[in-house]
């Protein structure tokens, strides 16, 4: 079975950057992207194979990333999936809110792609031991 990372982000440029950064780190997981929290929950509850990790953008249209995270954490089938909350925002209490809602890690989308790649790969290695 192929291991999948689910990316939840409404910005196609950010999705592509994440794909490029992950490819540069040598990760072998298949990447799947959805554009909203509602779409993520639909995908996760569809009966398809579950992803091994979720990268969830904090700011998504409709249902926020925090609300999406809360829904994932109360679902018995989904609550064990490691989840990294990602944001471009560097203002506000976002990081603590994410941890309070059940995020396993919090990652700022850096303007330096090398830094973003190193941080992301470090977290993936921590959560996705082969």
Report each predicted region and the residues it spans:
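Conserved acidic segment of CheY-like receiver
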Residues: 2-22, 54
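Active-site residues of response regulator receiver
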Residues: 56-58, 87
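Acidic, metal-coordinating helix/loop segments flanking the phosphotransfer/catalytic sites
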Residues: 33-53
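Receiver (REC) domain active-site loop signature in two-component systems and cognate sites
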Residues: 60-62
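C-terminal output helix
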Residues: 111-123
């Amino acid at each position: 079975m192929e291991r999948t990372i689910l990316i939840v982000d409404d910005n196609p440029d950010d999705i592509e950057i994440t794909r490029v950064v992950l490819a540069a780190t040598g990760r072998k997981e298949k990447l799947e992207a959805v554009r909203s929290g509602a779409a993520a929950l639909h995908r996760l509850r569809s009966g398809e194979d579950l992803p091994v990790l979720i990268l969830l953008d904090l700011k998504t249209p409709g249902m926020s990333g925090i609300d999406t995270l809360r829904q994932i954490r109360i679902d018995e089938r989904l609550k064990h999936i490691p989840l990294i909350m990602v944001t471009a925002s560097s203002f506000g209490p976002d990081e603590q809110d994410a941890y309070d809602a059940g995020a396993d890690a919090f990652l700022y989308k850096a303007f330096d792609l090398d830094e973003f790649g190193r941080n992301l790969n470090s977290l993936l290695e921590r959560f996705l031991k082969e």
